Amino acid sequence: MTIKSIKINFLLGKYICVMFVFFPVLSLFLGGLAWLRYGIDIPWFDDWRGYMDGNIHSLSLDYLFRSVNDTLAPVGFALDALAQRYLGGNSIAYQFISMISVLGGLMWLQWRLLIQSLQDKLQASVCFLLVIFMLQPDSYWGWENLAYHQALPLVFILMAINLIVFSEKSIKFIGPLIFILGVFAGFTYISGAVGVLVCSVTMMALSYYLFSGEKSINFRQKSLWLLAAGLTSSTPQIYFSIIKARGTHTG
């Protein structure tokens, strides 16, 4: 293989990487642009509940930790209250911010996991192209302001996974941070609590399979912090949504 052909292959691979990363980013940009252009600033379905009760702006613990739709969602309700206070409840502004931050965050975190795991930009970009299928604004945006609460736990979980897998800082610093991220995921929506539990158990199992020695112990210790967060959040979630409410969809 000549130097010229090597150079051509290198440039071709570089352009392919850029193209495969560009399309998902472009899709997110167009989704945000479409929402700014065609979005309607009006509450929709579940958004009306806070207005009718007159507490949509409330940050009281009783309000934030109430059980609604078979879940505790204090993190999401707090974000809704802040949006009401500082954005005037503007649906267009709120959903644009949540769409770009949540979907953009998921894209960035997945790219980081791919590039760190594969150690090859071309392979990572090919895999990254598949995130384009999750960039459907109508999934969690374009209807209720609060619908994105169900996607937000993924951001916290992926952040925790990044710390577990790649962070080399002291467990004394990383452990509590992983716990906080897990608790945020678990108290954003009930699916987040279940996701944290499943993820932590999976990570602990992988620590025996993928690593050995000190690295395996460190990986497992960080996973234990995530497990603690899963137990902390899933216990009240299960109590309020299944035991107390008896699985009845209310609110």
Model regions: which residues?
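Start-transfer (signal-anchor) and selected internal transmembrane alpha helices
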Residues: 1-30
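Perimembrane helix-loop-helix junctions
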Residues: 5, 195-231
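Helix-to-loop transition at the C-terminal end of transmembrane segments
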Residues: 29-49, 139-140, 236-251
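Membrane-proximal lumenal/periplasmic loop motifs of glycosylation machinery
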Residues: 38-43, 56-99
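Membrane-interface micro-motifs in multi-pass membrane enzymes
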Residues: 44-46, 73, 122-165, 187-189
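Transmembrane-helix motifs of polytopic, lipid-linked glycan transferases
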Residues: 96-121, 159-163
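Membrane-interface transmembrane helices that cradle and orient dolichyl/undecaprenyl
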Residues: 157-175, 212
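Membrane-interface alpha helices of multi-pass inner-membrane proteins
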Residues: 158, 173-196
